Amino acid sequence: MELQVVGANALTVSETTFGREFNEALIHQVVVAYAAGARQGSRAQKTRAEVSGSGKKPWRQKGTGRARSGDIRSPIWRSGGVTFAAKPQDHSQKVNKKMYRGAIKSILSELVRQDRLVVVDKFEIDAPKTKVLVQKLKELALEDVLIITASLDENLFLAARNLYKVDVRDAQGIDPVSLIAFDKVVVTVDAVKQIEEMLA
């Protein structure tokens, strides 16, 4: 199959990478796993066993008129432990390489079908200026965009850093969440070739 390149000849690409059927279930599973892997999982609370305080019975069982109590660290007391205390945990989910690659291919194919993938010969700017990048994006009628280059262009990265709906990645740094998060995905010809090799 062929992809149209802005201001250049069409680019022949693999049908298995850019012409794959949309697999919503697979994409959902991979995106959920990716988001789960980004969680810190460092939350921690103390149980009644871990809270500081004496284990002595505060007052005798009977005869005081007060409610019976055996421990000042009880969860129903102020400063007591937490009943079902949260503990640090690893939220990551296992995703096979084949599944991950399949999800990326499915997303790329859907971007092509929806005309959201814009292929350009090159995407460069002369200086790390946000103003210059904004002007270049206006020329291409782009606003909410992910820019993918073969290798990370420092000028481009620095210029895009202060723009709300613009992100710059190299071909190695693409992930399913960023691919579906933007309205358009601009990718250079060299990056397309690199992505094809990576997903082969």
From Swiss-Prot:
It comes from the Bacteria. One of its GO terms (biological process) is translation. The keyword NADP does not apply. GO terms for cellular component: ribonucleoprotein complex; ribosome. InterPro entries: Ribosomal_uL4, Ribosomal_uL4-like, Ribosomal_uL4_dom_sf. Keywords: Ribonucleoprotein, Ribosomal protein, RNA-binding, rRNA-binding. Gene3D superfamilies: 3.40.1370.10. Residues 43-71 are annotated as: Disordered. GO terms for molecular function: rRNA binding; structural constituent of ribosome. It holds the Pfam family Ribosomal_L4. NCBIfam families: rplD_bact. HAMAP family: Ribosomal_uL4_B. Part of the 50S ribosomal subunit. One of the primary rRNA binding proteins, this protein initially binds near the 5'-end of the 23S rRNA. It is important during the early stages of 50S assembly. It makes multiple contacts with different domains of the 23S rRNA in the assembled 50S subunit and ribosome. Belongs to the universal ribosomal protein uL4 family. This is Large ribosomal subunit protein uL4. It comes from Aggregatibacter actinomycetemcomitans (Actinobacillus actinomycetemcomitans).
